[in-house]
Amino acid sequence: MQLLSGPRFVSRLLGRKAQRPRSTRAHSSGALRAAFAAAGFAAATLAWAAGASAVASPVDRYPSAAAAYAVQIDGRLAWGRAIDTPRAPASLAKLLTAIVLLDKNWDPKSAIRVSESAAAMPAVHLGLRAGDSLRADDAMTAMLMRSANDACAALVEHAAGSFARFAHEMNERAHELGMSASHFVNPCGLDAAGQHTTARDLLRLAQAAYEYPAIAATVGRRNASIDTMAGEHLHFDNGNVLLGQMDGVIGVKSGFTSEAGRCLIALARRGPHEVWLVLLDSPNRWGVAAGILFEAFDLAAQSAPAAP
């Protein structure tokens, strides 16, 4: 399959003309820089190019992109909106769940039994039945790729016995990661009173999660097949449809609940450049993500030092 960049990928994916987030129309180096300046973005661009490691209030380059978003280019926070505003996490919380599970006495081959409560979890789910068993690593794959809540619940019950006990461990780990504006109530990211996070904290979480080889390998897969211990074969696709469709995208996680809206954390690498993107409540998250990543790599290439 031909890998596409920017809006062309969305055109093929959605079968309609792609729309970028509200931004520039020009792509040449001079025109793009002029557009930055005309829109009032020159100061943020210069700060990014100068090597600032953090920006307290990044430029809101894409006001229509999402309720909250953050864009980090080559380790520097470049653009964002409402990055410290509390938002529901949706299934992005499962990245923290995976970290806590892997930090425990993780045995990927251990048998995970599905309880009645796990089997009754709301969508998204695999359709596991009470009494089913599957390997821990297969349940982890389903949780991270498909956002399967039944697999998530089964893993958590096996590891901690209850959601409440596991949520306490999640909050301890979040504190260690510097996620000071986050609080978790359940491990699957379902809407719940008191459960909230921010775009800035989710950026920290995703980067920490990607340091775990088991997580990095899983979130970069386009599809997977697993078998229950009773021999039932299950096949599913990754919820992140950018994978395999947009050049350089290698992760990380999508999510949706009625309170959180459509959410996405994406990681893309092209040559020496790396872009992290967090979108929270973005109705057109795939088109928005494609447009932002396209322009982020454009900026990174322009700001790179000239070869000697």
Question: What does each model-found stretch correspond to?
Answer:
Residues 1-30:
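N-terminal secretory signal peptides that target proteins for export/translocation
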Residues 180-183, 191-308:
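Domain-terminus/edge residues, biased toward the C-terminal soluble/receptor-binding domains
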Residues 35-47:
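Bacterial N-terminal signal peptides
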